[in-house]
Design a protein with these regions (language model features):
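Short, flexible loop segments at the rims of nucleotide/cofactor-binding pockets, characterized by
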Residues: 41, 70-76, 99-103, 167-169, ...
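Long, well-ordered amphipathic alpha-helical subdomains in the mid-to-C-terminal portions
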Residues: 181-209
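Canonical P-loop GTPase G-domain recognition
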Residues: 120-180, 187-189, 218-227, 264-265, ...
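G-domain G4 guanine-recognition motif of GTPases
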Residues: 67, 98-102, 120-136, 147-156, ...
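C-terminal effector/interaction modules appended to NTPase cores
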Residues: 1, 11, 19-25, 201-404
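Conserved G1/Walker A P-loop phosphate-binding module
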Residues: 1-78, 86-89
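Conserved C-terminal guanine-recognition region of P-loop GTPase G domains, centered on the G4
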Residues: 52-60, 79-147, 177-180, 203-219, ...
Length: 404
């Protein structure tokens, strides 16, 4: 994706579900006005979920997800069906595609039950409908809004776009990343280490998003490396309102920054933005109970190239061993992979999830809670290990109560 484009994690995720040859790929091409998806009469053309980042009016920036048919057969087919079902965990709006010449069957209704169980907004779209169709009876049977469209002639495609736009969740009351922590005219200092793990020639996504959030709030953002932090603070005429740092230099930054200046990290901001900061604060207490052999799952939302000083696979495990004095067994997941059975783990430590949308991160937290496994966040864990958790939560008075 273009680095100037809306991040995929910030786009409305629209999942297209249905049986093989129901017309899912043709519908995607019609909605987007482009030949993005391969269309064939051969069943099972789409073998894995395919993601298409688009700008579609009146929806705005979206991520269209074309999924394998839910009626795929055989051992490999069952794996494809499972992948299609997993897409529900990151879907904001679902489209159930039904061939109008066949009508819905038990597989369609079973999938619809899964969708409604997750409380997702959904439209049942009957494809291959060249003439007007009365779907009143189907709406009664399925219990959801139904629309008849033709991907060939474009019939009702514009109306479908409008209907989808009406289902977009209201963002007015959603959690801000950083804008609610500053006032217009405030100064914020961002501490960004440039080490071997840092991408060449650019800032990573969390840093970009925090800078934009500060600018949108009318604040001034200063960006510095940890090595230049002291000189940066000395150059400012007044103390900054807040310091936001990379978690891996928490210890140094906490010693350098005056105690009357708010301090937190990019990772903690994202735990509040996409996850559940209260749950992360509760979960981190498990660190003091870790013993030899306890399994700890470290999970990341992206699949970046591992460096010799990688935070997830090298630094964090080393800090945990030193803090606990124990030898736990670490396991890792990355990208879209996330263990279904979490009961074997003593705790889970998750990254800030800048590459995951809120829906998927909330699903992971829910899985951990439902299975009774404490889950926390990189930034929270590192602050806890450094003995500065209370200080890093000062910007969030409601969260501080969890430490009482």
């Amino acid at each position: 994706m273009d680095l100037n484009a809306t991040p995929s994690s910030e786009r409305i995720h629209i999942g297209i579900f249905g049986k093989r040859n129901a017309g899912k790929s043709s519908l995607i091409n019609a909605i987007t006005g482009q030949n993005l998806a391969i269309v064939s009469d051969t069943k099972g053309t789409t073998t894995d979920p395919v993601y298409k980042a688009m700008e579609i009016l009146p929806l705005g920036p979206v991520m269209i997800i074309d999924t394998p048919g839910i009626d795929d057969e055989g051992e490999l087919g069952a794996q494809r069906v499972q992948k299609a079902v997993q897409v529900l965990n990151k879907t904001d709006i679902a489209i159930l595609v039904i061939d109008s010449t066949l009508g819905p069957d038990k597989e369609d209704t079973a999938l619809l039950a899964r969708i409604t169980e997750k409380k997702l907004p959904v439209i049942a779209v009957f494809t291959k409908a060249e003439a007007a169709a009365d779907l009143t009876n189907y709406e009664k049977i399925l219990g959801v809004k139904c629309m008849a469209v033709s991907s060939v002639s474009g019939r009702n495609i514009a109306e479908l776009r409008t209907a989808l736009a009406a289902l977009v969740p209201d963002k007015k009351s959603t959690q801000q990343l950083v804008g609610d922590l500053v006032n217009p005219g405030d100064t914020a200092v961002l501490v960004v280490p440039v080490d071997s793990a840092a991408p060449k020639g650019r800032l990573i996504l969390p840093q970009q998003q925090v800078i934009r959030g500060l600018l949108d709030a009318g604040a001034t953002a200063f960006v510095t490396q940890d090595k230049q932090l002291e000189s940066c603070l000395d150059a400012l005429k007044e103390k900054p309102k807040i310091i936001i740092t990379d978690s891996q230099v928490f210890g140094f930054v906490a010693k350098t920054v005056p105690n009357d200046v708010l301090l937190t990290s990019f990772s903690i901001l994202f735990a509040r933005y996409k996850g559940d900061l209260k749950e992360a604060v509760r979960g981190v207490n498990m660190l003091k109970h870790i013993k030899n052999g306890d399994r700890i799952l470290i999970s990341e939302g992206c699949t970046h190239h591992r460096q010799c000083d990688d935070i997830g696979t090298v630094k964090l495990p080393a800090w945990i061993k030193k803090f606990t004095g124990a030898e736990p067994a670490f396991e890792w997941t990355s990208g879209t992979a996330f263990a279904e059975d979490l009961t074997k783990y003593k705790m889970i430590i998750h990254c800030g999830a800048c590459m995951l949308n809120e829906k998927e991160m909330q699903h992971r937290i829910s899985c951990a809670k439902n299975q009774g496994v404490p889950i926390t966040n990189y930034g929270i864990a590192i602050a806890y290990i450094n003995g500065i958790l209370r200080r890093t939560l000062q910007p969030f008075p409601d969260i501080l109560k969890e430490l009482e």
